[in-house]
Amino acid sequence: MKPFKLLLVLLISFVLFTSFSTEFTVKDKIVILAHAGYVSHYSTGLKYPVEVEWWDTKARLGCTTKFPRKDQFAPDPLLPAETSLADDYSGSGFDRGHMCPAADNQCDSEFLTECFYFSNMAPQYHSLNAGVWKTLETRTREFAEQLDSVKVWCGNIGSVSKIGEVSVPAKCWKVIYIKKTKVWEAYVFENTKEQSKKLDQLKVKVSDVEKLTGFKFKP
């Protein structure tokens, strides 16, 4: 039995979303969904996760045989009515952008299935999803493979438009903490079609992300 799985069935708590960035114009309900491979703070109003967190480790990433990615996107069984979003994304022109990426989960079939829940997705322009966002995902895995344990937090903020009932976030962000070296890195990405900046140009202070989101990051 995996650690988070012990809490899986009904570890759902509701928080009135009043302390987060003023970019949110309405009070919003956030549902905490604890899965075996990640925890999602999912907005029922925006229909995307405002924060997702997990640990990348050598053990998590280091298998010799990986499960194949099948792209079976699905509602989250902990919150199916709020995460049945396949039709909203279909034909929208936006990628179903993973927060906890598939490549972090291919050593465990349960992890891989869970990471395709819509509670782990946000609409991203392909240029972001396949560009600097993917570059940072790879960088994070390399840190974990070399230095053993990396805590990852990432999420989305704001709403510039909608695809069906799903808000398109204005920004995406990620914070990582490397346990062995006690090094932190933080990034904020504009969710726009044109992506001209390199990853290093998007680096910010952790305190900047805390101010933007209202989250306090502690490993």
List where the protein language model places each region.
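Domain-level detector of nuclease and nuclease-like folds
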Residues: 77-219
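Extreme N-terminus nucleophile/cap motif
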Residues: 19-36
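Short linear sequence motifs
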Residues: 7-13, 31, 35, 66, ...
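Short, surface-exposed charged micro-motifs
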Residues: 30, 39-41, 174-176
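Bacterial Sec-dependent N-terminal signal peptides
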Residues: 1-23
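Short, His- and charge-rich active-site/binding loops that engage polyanionic ligands
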Residues: 33-95
